[in-house]
């Protein structure tokens, strides 16, 4: 679990997301409160529940990007789901309980990787011994079993030194590796994914673990052997329990597009299989219940839920009152301005302009963006958003792709050339499209 302070979390988010300070502060405080809660005594810790967050803002302003970056910072079980993927219990489609099952699967994977990393040094030693056994087979006793000498021979030590120095990396050896489990593909009817998963696990475990000889270079064999030996050092039961504890105490669920499961203006009629019904099914999860998974029972009382939506047609008040009450912290994300677009093009660590420069550099083409060129690109994107659909920062991708289309096409024949993208270049390539609303609607 991350021990970063709210200021450190915001600073890290600032490297990738421009503006939206209120949203960054809210998620950073929520993340820090997870750590604060774990410092309390057990009795009080049980009483402190997370304050769930509802992020409201137009499309393309950074809601989903905040979730993506938060997942990397949290160092905790994290899952992002789309609210529109679920239907009410009893109908064809995914049930909301599958959110917790998927979160538990993510936790199992995360804890397994942590456990493998913890045992990596010991696994490396064991993998090294297995390779040395192939290079210098140990002497065998009368029953054909390998004898373990009290001290390694001089030849074995010499090979060990060469192995560690990488002198034997390209030498081919034949070594026994665990065979991949039998793959059984089962087409699952909607809503029965859990049963299908259990059937697949059962078929994969049939016949036990088998060894299969493979011919590999030593450097490739070493990687596979380290993974295999590290996996042997992991206790499956301890791993399951640790993963379930991680989900219950530190789990974070990000529910995107929650506005799409609202009744539009509260006046929709007819069956609401994937709208109000889903909201009612979400209630127990958000409030706290116990969900059965293939790894064990998982309590959701202390899982943090962050919901987000554009709310362009519906409004937050169109959510059912019970769900509104369980999302007490409201954060509004602001629409992006021309100045925000300029900052998005230049400030993030891997901004779009940096990406295009790097892509073209692979073919020996140097692209330079001038300050007035950046301003003109930002103005063009903002203008198209205003006159057509406002899709936020995503419009920059469309505009830039159109702008460098000719360079991308001819890059292989432009080795060593420098292309300067200034205001004049941008105007030449985009002005006609931006001015014509019909063209910009279909092309930009």
Swiss-Prot record:
Keyword vocabulary terms for this entry: ATP-binding, Chaperone, Cytoplasm, Nucleotide-binding
Positions bound to ATP: 18, 60-65, 256, 322, 394
GO cellular component: HslUV protease complex
Primary location class: cytoplasm
Disulfide feature: none
Gene3D superfamilies per the UniProt record, alphabetical: 1.10.8.60, DNA helicase RuvA subunit, C-terminal domain, P-loop containing nucleotide triphosphate hydrolases
GO annotation, biological process: protein unfolding; proteolysis involved in protein catabolic process
GO MF annotation, one: proteasome-activating activity
Xref: CDD domains: RecA-like_HslU (cd19498)
Record-linked InterPro entries: AAA+_ATPase, ATP-dep_Clp_protease_ClpX, ATPase_AAA_core, Clp_ATPase_C, HslU, P-loop_NTPase
Record's subcellular location: Cytoplasm
Presence of keyword Iron: no
One Pfam family cited in the UniProt record for this chain: AAA_2
PANTHER family in alphabetical order: ATP-DEPENDENT CLP PROTEASE ATP-BINDING SUBUNIT CLPX-LIKE, MITOCHONDRIAL-RELATED, ATP-DEPENDENT PROTEASE ATPASE SUBUNIT HSLU
HAMAP family named in the record: HslU (MF_00249)
Subunit structure comment from the entry: A double ring-shaped homohexamer of HslV is capped on each side by a ring-shaped HslU homohexamer. The assembly of the HslU/HslV complex is dependent on binding of ATP.
Summary of the function given for this chain in its UniProt record: ATPase subunit of a proteasome-like degradation complex; this subunit has chaperone activity. The binding of ATP and its subsequent hydrolysis by HslU are essential for unfolding of protein substrates subsequently hydrolyzed by HslV. HslU recognizes the N-terminal part of its protein substrates and unfolds these before they are guided to HslV for hydrolysis.
Annotated family: Belongs to the ClpX chaperone family. HslU subfamily.
Protein name: ATP-dependent protease ATPase subunit HslU
Organism the protein comes from: Klebsiella pneumoniae subsp. pneumoniae (strain ATCC 700721 / MGH 78578)
């Amino acid at each position: 679990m991350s021990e970063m302070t709210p200021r450190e979390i915001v600073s890290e988010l600032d490297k990738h997301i421009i503006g939206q300070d209120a949203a960054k502060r809210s998620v950073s405080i929520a993340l820090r409160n997870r750590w604060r809660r774990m410092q309390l005594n057990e009795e009080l810790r049980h009483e402190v529940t997370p304050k769930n967050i509802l992020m409201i803002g137009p499309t393309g302003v950074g809601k989903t990007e905040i979730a993506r970056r938060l997942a990397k910072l949290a160092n905790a079980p994290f899952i992002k789901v789309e609210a529109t993927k679920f239907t009410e219990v009893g109908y064809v489609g995914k049930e909301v309980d599958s959110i917790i099952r998927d979160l538990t699967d993510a936790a199992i994977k995360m804890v397994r990787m942590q456990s493998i990393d913890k045992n990596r040094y010991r696994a490396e030693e064991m993998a090294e011994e297995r390779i040395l056994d192939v290079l210098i087979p140990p002497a065998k006793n009368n029953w054909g079993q390998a004898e373990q000498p009290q001290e390694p021979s001089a030849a074995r030590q010499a090979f060990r030194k060469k192995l560690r120095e990488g002198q034997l990396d390209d030498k081919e050896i034949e070594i026994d590796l665990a065979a991949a489990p039998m793959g059984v593909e089962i087409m699952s009817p909607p809503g029965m994914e859990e049963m299908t998963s259990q059937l697949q696990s059962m078929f994969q475990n049939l016949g036990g673990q088998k060894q299969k000889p493979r011919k590999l270079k030593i450097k490739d064999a070493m990687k596979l052997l380290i993974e295999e030996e590290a996996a042997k050092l992991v206790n499956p039961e301890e791993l399951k329990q640790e993963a379930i504890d991680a989900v219950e105490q530190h789990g974070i669920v990000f529910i995107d597009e929650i506005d799409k499961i609202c009744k539009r203006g509260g006046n929709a009629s007819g069956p609401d299989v994937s709208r109000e019904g889903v909201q009612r099914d979400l209630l127990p999860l958000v409030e706290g219940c116990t969900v059965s998974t293939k790894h064990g029972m998982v309590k959701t009382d202390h899982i943090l839920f962050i919901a987000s939506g554009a709310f362009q047609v519906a409004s937050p008040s169109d959510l059912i009152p019970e769900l509104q009450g369980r999302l007490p912290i409201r954060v509004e994300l602001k629409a992006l301005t021309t100045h925000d677009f300029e900052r998005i093009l230049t400030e993030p660590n891997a901004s779009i302009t940096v990406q295009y420069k790097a892509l073209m550099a692979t073919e020996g083409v140097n692209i330079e963006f001038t300050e007035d060129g950046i301003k003109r690109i930002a103005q063009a994107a903002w203008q198209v958003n205003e006159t057509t659909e406002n899709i936020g920062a995503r419009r920059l991708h469309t505009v830039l792709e159109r702008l460098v289309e000719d360079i991308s096409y001819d890059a292989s024949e432009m080795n060593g050339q420098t292309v300067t993208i200034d205001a004049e270049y941008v105007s030449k390539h985009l002005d006609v499209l931006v001015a014509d609303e019909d063209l910009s609607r279909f092309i930009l």
